[in-house]
Amino acid sequence: MGQELSQHELYVEQLKKALKTRGVKVKGNDLLKFFDFVKDTCPWFPQEGTIDIKRWRRVGDCFQDYYNTFGPEKIPVTAFSYWNLIKDLIDKKEADPQVMAAVTQTEKILKVSSQTDLRDNSHNKDMDLISLESDDEEAKAPSEKMTMSNKSPKKYPAMLASQNNNTDKDPDLSEVDWDGLEDEAAKYHNPDWPPFLSRPPPYNRTAATAPAVMAVVNPKEELKEKISQLEEQIKLEELHQSLIIRLQKLKTGNERVTSSGNIESHSRTPKWPGQCLPKGKYLINKNTEEYPPKDIFPVTETMDGQGQAWRHHNGFDFTVIKELKTAVSQYGATAPYTLAIVESIADNWLTPTDWNTLVRAVLSGGDHLIWKSEFFENCRDTAKRNQQAGNGWDFDMLTGSGNYANTDAQMQYDPGLFAQIQAAATNAWRKLPVKGDPGASLTGVKQGPDEPFADFVHRLITTAGRIFGNAEAGVDYVKQLAYENANPACQAAIRPYRKKTDLTGYIRLCSDIGPSYQQGLAMAAAFSGQTVKDLLNNKNKDRGGCFKCGKKGHFAKDCRDHSNKNPESKVPGLCPRCKRGKHWANECKSKTDSQGNPLPPHQGNRDEGPAPGPEASLWGSQLCSSQQQQSISKLNRASPGSAGLDLCSTTHTVLTPEMGPQTLATGVYGPLPPNTFGLILGRGSTTVKGLQIYPGVIDNDYTGEFKIMARAISSIITIPQGERIAQLVLLPLLRTAHKIQHPYRGDKNFGSSDIFWVQPITHQKPSLVLWLDGKAFTGLIDTGADVTIIKQEDWPSHWPTTETLTNLRGIGQSNNPRQSSKYLTWKDKENNSGLIKPFVIPNLPVNLWGRDLLSQMKIMMCSPNDIVTAQMLAQGYSPGKGLGKREDGILQPIPNSGQLDRKGFGNFLATAVDILAPQRYADPITWKSDEPVWVDQWPLTQEKLAAAQQLVQEQLQAGHIIESNSPWNTPIFVIKKKSGKWRLLQDLRAVNATMVLMGALQPGLPSPVAIPQGYFKIVIDLKDCFFTIPLQPVDQKRFAFSLPSTNFKQPMKRYQWKVLPQGMANSPTLCQKYVAAAIEPVRKSWAQMYIIHYMDDILIAGKLGEQVLQCFAQLKQALTTTGLQIAPEKVQLQDPYTYLGFQINGPKITNQKAVIRRDKLQTLNDFQKLLGDINWLRPYLHLTTGDLKPLFDILKGDSNPNSPRSLSEAALASLQKVETAIAEQFVTQIDYTQPLTFLIFNTTLTPTGLFWQNNPVMWVHLPASPKKVLLPYYDAIADLIILGRDNSKKYFGLEPSTIIQPYSKSQIHWLMQNTETWPIACASYAGNIDNHYPPNKLIQFCKLHAVVFPRIISKTPLDNALLVFTDGSSTGIAAYTFEKTTVRFKTSHTSAQLVELQALIAVLSAFPHRALNVYTDSAYLAHSIPLLETVSHIKHISDTAKFFLQCQQLIYNRSIPFYLGHIRAHSGLPGPLSQGNHITDLATKVVATTLTTNLTEAQTAHALHHLNAQSLRLMFKITREQARQIVKQCPTCVTYLPIPHFGVNPKGLVPNMLWQMDVTHYSEFGKLKYVHVSIDTFSGFLVATLQTGEATKHVIAHLLHCFSIIGQPIHIKTDNGPGYTSSNFRAFCSKLHIKHTFGIPYNPQGQGIVERAHLSLKNTLEKIKKGEWYPTQGSPRNILNHALFILNFLNLDAQNKSAADRFWHTSSKKEYAMVKWKDPLDNTWHGPDPVLIWGRGSVCVYSQTHDAARWLPERLVRQVSNVTQSRE
């Protein structure tokens, strides 16, 4: 099939006939063109020789690939439609017999007609009509194929007709030439098929079949004209119409008939034969008066019995809309389930109005706006294609706008147009945003500098939808924000069209704007000499003319001036550079020569200037450079006093932060004046603008061009030509005798660029060969893998692995993979090495090098700029080569830390600038408060002030301090060292109190004995470590200080530390962390090294000396990179090493020779320092605690550090032992290959431990002061075992293999059963515990002390022993009872324990030779006394140690054992033991013979409450003088003056009538320092509360507390504080009916009563806080409550009443003096009335007439003699 042309045409003819049987008429030429396209896209198809459904689907796959590759424009419009028709034909199992019968009958009818006329008119293309069937026959059941009226029409339904057998014999039908008619009719139906679908129909679920074109299509104007010309053939037209109706009836079976009247009334314009479409949305039924159905969607079409088509809206099921709405809400608009519903709905004919109604119903406002924008854009594109196809379907028809805005017009659309509408709508739906949570602020949605405008509009519309709900309501606002919130580039693009287009137009205008557009604008601005802003505003204006002559009107290629300069042009010959063409060498652009070898860049200067190297990249390069050379004499100064010469840029330059440092030409050339050199510095104004100028040095003998190294800091910077950006400072040249490497520099540069163009990643796999323990492995570099993985097939079988508990996850998952049991040494081709533990996984296709290995290799990932890459390629450079002219650049990327062995970046700065590492700081300090701390600077003497000024200047020059305006300040001072030099210190105690202290990172001192024997070592000391570690900038202001001046001659100069200050509490910890972080990379790279770091001392040790040196070199670089400096003079490379106060000489470690100065040992502080140093050395000396005990005893006594101390003879002998031991003793380094033994010696007082390996390794000592008062020796040995095991793991990382101690196995067995410490000490110990010491003289010397084991005190009661009971009382009486005899005696102690201990001593002294069973009711003695037999040292505390020593001597002197048991006192149990204890207890009781006197009680009460003399006199009935003497003898009360008597402030007449209230401060209560005080003026009862402030809420809280104690007052008087004058407090008083008045402002006398109460309260607080009662350790509330208790209940007045008595128990009867008084208002006399209060100059009279009190001057009152009145 298809191999010959005739066969090709024959196949097409047969295919036409086959299609015709299905009612489909196509054009033969179109089918030929279709199979030509099949042949082009499927070359294999003609060779198949046959066709079936499988091969035809393969053709469809080829169409799909072609469509995806070239798009819809390159594929024929009818390709997929024909493919679908043929697919249905091939897939059909059998022909439809009804269709076959109809065809046969039609042929007969057409033959009767005028066949000749038809044939003549067969070439009239405009008369042919076509009917295409699009129903998917394959998907239908046979019953469905027969009846179509019950199915809703598909997306492209065929015309429906009634199935009526009676019409088969229509006499009006005649025969016609069907072949010619079908060919001609097919032409009018190609436009009916939808030519532009979003996806080809065979692969679109919503359009799975080809579109079927209606029998009546949208006619053209030419068709109308030709129909009018063929009026004579009307009979043929009628027959043709009947034919079509008949065929459609057979196919659809629709027999619906409508009267002709209806047809005529609902016809549309233009009208085509055989079709009449209604304008209405529903069919009018004349026979009924039913209401028309609801107008919804979609459009359906039916045919009546007369062959007339009717369209109307069918009622759509609203459950589908609800389902779609639910899917959008729950899953999102673009979820697969939602799209499936939309595609199902799109199978119907939905008009544009229907789509808009549906979308508005189910989508939010923002999403609806997005859909509408996308739908209009799709329709606009489709309309353009329709215009090219000439089918007349314009934008208004597709969108339902303009003349097609109503549903009537949209119902008349052709099926092909409906198909395009459905495609545009579904495509717009698919572009809806994914369900998310956009922001709520619409004005806050702004476009980023590199964000695409479409993404920005999408975010804006989404946010608008959430805010407005209906996006159309805010479309104008969204459009305005889309312009205002766009970035400058997009605003410039939109500005000319801002009012001429909508959001869709905005998106099109900004579609090409992105990062590359921004960079292009910057380049264009530089080319044109404009700023970016000016360029954007003027980009549509004329940009100029010729680049050669500068004139407008022509281009450079047509410039006559340029051509006239060289009238006689020479013809170039063969290029001497590439030898491949005829052109000039300076114009050669070849990258390779004729042999294919790469060519180097151009050498020398050409018209374009020097070859582009590091100093001339295209970004920031010369764009319009001037070629004039200027000397330094041409430079200008800004002013006569300017130190620098101005340097300008000769180019219009654009710099971006991504470009890094760039060189700028200045046009100034050397040399400099004689004996000078130049320093290039930046101007301050350029730094403010964001341009950083790197400083550079210009040599005196440099004759080349001076260039400026500049970098844009954070944004794009445009440097106009001629702008001053730097200055050249000339300095005198100092010539030294250093070695000269080059005789003369000239215009040459030293070295090459440090830049290396990294080769980009290609399709080739990035593999790498590494050696693991000498075996080569090839693997892929995987930056996404955390760990390195080796496939099991490559893993050697003899290399051990272990199963891990981790899971590896990637594309797959590996549970519990195996990992190498040991670290493997990796090595690459450059001999770089490290350690790695890879994982081993089976069935892995390739080995993977993960980040655990790549980080050790220092592999870096670079993202090159595409523009830079293109520029480099254009200049002839290749990746992998240096960019210098000699291509000898360093072949590695520039690291972030800079290169310390090379200076500069580029050429001209090769000897000028160091690219320093990024500044590192110490960790930030956490502060408790941000409130500034200011401590005034104290005065300094003239000598110390001069020293301080000199030291400050030195620190200022060193950069350790800077000038400061900080609000913090702490004083400084200077001290003179032994060498005579001064040292600057700062008192930072106040600052330290405000910071959170960091814990110690190294709680112990590292020991050099843990270094393995035989290791090579290097010792390093860091220079001024604190001063090389910078503080965090935010912390520097807190360490400010002031430098004073004598006689305040000038303001103090203020400075602050930039580095760690000495004296700051966290400086040691920050120093350790900073240095440790610098060393950490070296530790990881050299894991096999033994590296010790303590503060600023570092020790490196290793097996191989070469590795130690390499590690030292890397460590040196790491320290230098972080700013730390190594002191060269303190680097130790050979024995003997001095480290941390020890001398290391081979395996031996000795202490440095020390001479102890005795003349300085005078105070407790001196001896404390000395013994601290000696105790530090004890691990390396075999000095026992007993040897040092005389020295330790000196520390006892007075705790004052300056208290005098002196050396006793025993202490002097101990000091000599220390000196001898320091000089003679040594220890050795540990050998990890030998077992480690821990020896315990039973030395005097406490045992001593020693780690042993044929020589002493480390001595271990217990603390000089035991934790317990009585520590048995065997418990001390157990404590030493615990300490030794801990030290072994702490220093050596292992447990001792053997512990040798002095007890035998039986004794250890006893200790395990009867003590608590021994089982703990030996718990989980897997080694050996022995008592056989190695044969060594040192060990034998240490074994001289005998072992003490209990033998006198029995653990159980003895038989036939004397029964004794002991007891003691706090009365000082001790007693013991034996054999019905009681002995009691008086002691001088009041402690019951000490008294009973003396009773026990008396028992042991009375019966030294008798066996005893002693019972005591003291559990403490019953536990302590049995320990005395084995205690070697008793801790001295008070008098207890003295009695324990006496008791211990009695035990040692006994030869007969005794038993000491405990019995509970007052148990009430029967029996002789309880009875004997009770008798003894009664003997300690004493009957008081004298009562405590009142004076003693008064003294006790005053000591407890500090009562005044009057209260003591009245309460305890003592004399006035005795009470006064008690108060005078009190050291607390004597400092407080007596409180004056109550004054004359108005008082309440009854309780709670008048209160005074105020607030006082007591700072010692901290946050509760605000003490609110209220006092009842009648009784003086005081109520106070602690509050955290003085606001109204605190006042109200205080009053509520007062109400709960003494009730509610009638009247409250306060001052004018804000808490009392507020409206809230006024409302509070008003609601409770409390009268509130204020005193006289700023006059405290108006509040005199409460002010005196403040004084009384504070004095009481001060008194009781110094006492010995519990409130001194209590909370502030306890102390306040105690004071109120004293003032209200204990202090008595002259009537022997307290304030509480006066308040709660007022007198029921009282006599008042009677007076007459004059009213000053009317000068009338009244009375006699009683006097309530008679004050100083004033009298309070109670007017019985007015029932109110009146205050009157004393002069207006006359007393009635001897007249009184009682008041009940």
Swiss-Prot record:
Gag polyprotein: Late-budding domains (L domains) are short sequence motifs essential for viral particle release. They can occur individually or in close proximity within structural proteins. They interacts with sorting cellular proteins of the multivesicular body (MVB) pathway. Most of these proteins are class E vacuolar protein sorting factors belonging to ESCRT-I, ESCRT-II or ESCRT-III complexes. Phosphorylated protein pp24 and phosphorylated protein pp18 contains one L domain: a PPXY motif which binds to the WW domains of the ubiquitin ligase NEDD4. PANTHER family: ENDOGENOUS RETROVIRUS GROUP K MEMBER POL PROTEIN, RNA-DIRECTED DNA POLYMERASE-RELATED. Mg(2+) 2 binds at residues 1367, 1396, 1417, 1481. Residues 215-251 form a coiled coil. Residues 956-1144 form the Reverse transcriptase domain. Its EC number is 3.6.1.23, 3.4.23.-, 2.7.7.49, 2.7.7.7. This is Gag-Pro-Pol polyprotein.
